[in-house]
From Swiss-Prot:
It is found in: Periplasm. Belongs to the periplasmic pilus chaperone family. One of its GO terms (biological process) is chaperone-mediated protein folding. Part of the yfcOPQRSUV fimbrial operon. Could contribute to adhesion to various surfaces in specific environmental niches. Increases adhesion to eukaryotic T24 bladder epithelial cells in the absence of fim genes. Induction: Expression is negatively regulated by H-NS and subjected to cAMP receptor protein (CRP)-mediated catabolite repression. Its main location: periplasm. This is Probable fimbrial chaperone YfcS. The keyword Signal applies.
Length: 250
């Protein structure tokens, strides 16, 4: 009987570990105060508030920066302090600081990094207890001075175009900013097209839409505030432009 109970516990643990990183981060006790960070060159540094939402326990919060490929770095951006204690239902704060070689980043386009925070729970006094350190990872965009002024009325994402070839579409980003596409569907607020996965489109690049579509897709992008906004398109032949009026109305 004890073997069966042990097996059941191991199965439950395995299932929990197989949950996606996104699902786990949603359960984290220590979370940042936003879903993305914008670091303007003129700011020199930015502050991030970390909240411990656990009603009873204090946590350690470990923070760091990764480059676009997921490598942990301490330059051209670093986090201070890298580790701190945050008491129950209290806030902590970290500073993302630019280092001297930040001047080597491109001045004509955004650069993308990742801000990470891992919660470390206090050691449990209960025997045979599995503790999991959950981690939250959000995008951090470094924006050079020439690109700091952005218009919410005429967002750069409205400059995205599509090129059609049968059921295949290519997404073109002619701007110096990153474009994050979180959804592609046949209609506004529709279910994602089968097989679609979110796109991170680098500045001035073109990527294929990773699904086939019978009709012109409605894309959803993520803006600076983490809001999801629609992109409706009008096509002339195989070239499709954003319908700005309809996209603004949502």
């Amino acid at each position: 009987m004890s073997d069966l109970l042990c097996s059941a516990k191991l199965g439950a643990m395995t299932l929990a570990l197989l949950l996606s990183a996104t699902s786990l981060s949603a359960l984290a006790s220590v979370t940042p105060d936003r879903t993305r960070l914008i670091f303007n060159e003129s700011d020199k540094s930015i502050s991030v508030t970390l909240r411990n939402n656990d009603p009873k326990l204090p946590y350690l919060a470990q923070s760091w920066i990764e480059d676009e490929k997921g490598n942990k770095i301490t330059s051209p951006l670093t986090v201070l302090p890298p580790v701190q204690r945050i008491d129950s239902m209290m806030n902590g704060q970290v500073k993302v600081q630019g280092m001297p070689d930040i001047n080597k980043l491109p001045a004509d386009r955004e650069s993308m990094f990742y801000f990470n925070v891992r919660e470390i729970p206090p050691k449990s006094n209960k025997p045979n207890t599995l503790q999991i350190a959950l981690q939250t990872r959000i995008k951090l965009f470094w924006r050079p001075k020439a690109l700091e002024k952005v218009s919410m009325k005429s967002p750069w994402q409205h400059k995205v175009t599509l090129t059609r070839s049968g059921q295949a579409f290519t997404v073109n980003n002619p701007t110096p900013y990153y474009v994050i596409i979180s959804n592609a569907s046949a209609q506004k607020n529709g279910n994602p097209a089968a097989g679609f996965s979110p796109l991170v489109i680098e500045p001035k690049t073109t990527v294929p839409l990773n699904v086939k579509m019978d009709s012109v897709p409605v894309l959803t992008y993520v803006n600076d505030f983490g809001a999801r906004m629609p992109l409706f398109f009008q096509c002339n032949g195989n070239s499709c432009q954003v319908d700005e009026e309809q996209s603004r109305k949502g």
